[in-house]
Every structure is written in structure tokens, then in C-alpha cells.
Amino acid sequence: RNFYEPSVRVPMLAYCPELIPAGRTVEEMVQNIDVAPTIMAACGLAKAPQMCGESFLPLLKGGTAADWRKRIYYEYYWEYAFPQTPTVFGVRTDRYKYIRYHGIWDTNEFFDLQEDPYETVNLIDHPELQDTIRSLANDLYDWLETTGGMQIPLKRSVYYRHGDHRNAKTY
């Protein structure tokens, strides 16, 4: 429920000696949406048209990544069951990460991952980085508009355990 590196950089092991050289490490930005297309490609199947991810099998085989993604996006929407976690949008490149919070938090974050891989220094207010921050923020919002991410997905939900807060007079 956050866009920090320990939640994003999840290790993955792949074993297929017929296709993948032993000891191969992929440094490119791969996402969970890429796993199914990769398995399908390894099985000789075409990716389904509605799938958003891409096969990273060429990367596993040691191929070049000239046309591989240069950034990843993140979106997490507030949930009733986790009220302390805000809606979060983010974009990450090889070097920078911009995180946009919505709600009462509203303290956005910007990190230089080359200089600060543990994300301990928020650079959001640094004057010399404002052009980069604006560029990533615009890119993030362009992506959200293209993918429908600006429409907050609300589920029909009734939580009887807590009742109707208007009528319960407690929160």
C-alpha cells in the first residue's frame, strides 16, 4: 500500500534452463503485469490483447532492452478496510521517483534513487529539481488520464459490522 522501494522491488526467481541462462539478473523495470505474458511467451503462446503487460522473456534470455519501458507507474486507491492509507499515485524512472498523495496527507515525495536508494531524503521542495518534478507529475497525470485512473473506483459496499456511521453516532 505504498510506493517505496521495498514494496516495488520484489525479488523473483525464474527457472527454465531451456530458455534462461543460469545466473541471469534482469535490471530493467519489470512489473507484476509482465509475469503472465512472460509465461505465455515461454509456452509459445501469444499475449491476449486485453493484457497490459509485456513479456520480459527476451530480457531473461540476455537480450537488449532498447524498447523496454523507461518508467513504471503506481496507483493505490483508499480502501474502507485501510482508512489510514491514502490514495497514492506515483511514477518511477531509473533515477527518480515522484509520489503523489491525496487526502489529508498531501505531502508529496520526490527521491533521487541514485543518490538516496533508501528514500530517506524527500527532495520535493528543492528548487533546482522543480522542472524534473513537474515533468514527472505531468507524465503521471497524462498516464492516469489515458488509463482512466482519474476516476476513483468506488465499490458498492455495506459494512454491517460498523453500521451506518450517520446513524451510529460514532466513528
Task: Cite the ranges covered by each PLM segment.
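Substrate-binding rim/cap in mid-to-C-terminal beta-strand-loop elements of soluble/periplasmic
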Residues: 1-50, 54-66, 94
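Structural motif
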Residues: 7, 88, 95-96, 108
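Conserved hydrophobic/aromatic beta-strand scaffold that supports enzyme active sites
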Residues: 13, 88-90, 110
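WW-domain-binding short linear motifs
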Residues: 70-74, 158
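Residues that act as N-cap/strand-start positions at coil-to-secondary-structure junctions
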Residues: 83-85
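Short beta-strand micro-motifs enriched in acidic
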Residues: 99-103
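Intrinsically disordered, low-complexity polar regions and short flexible loop motifs
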Residues: 116
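Long, internal low-complexity/basic segments
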Residues: 123-171
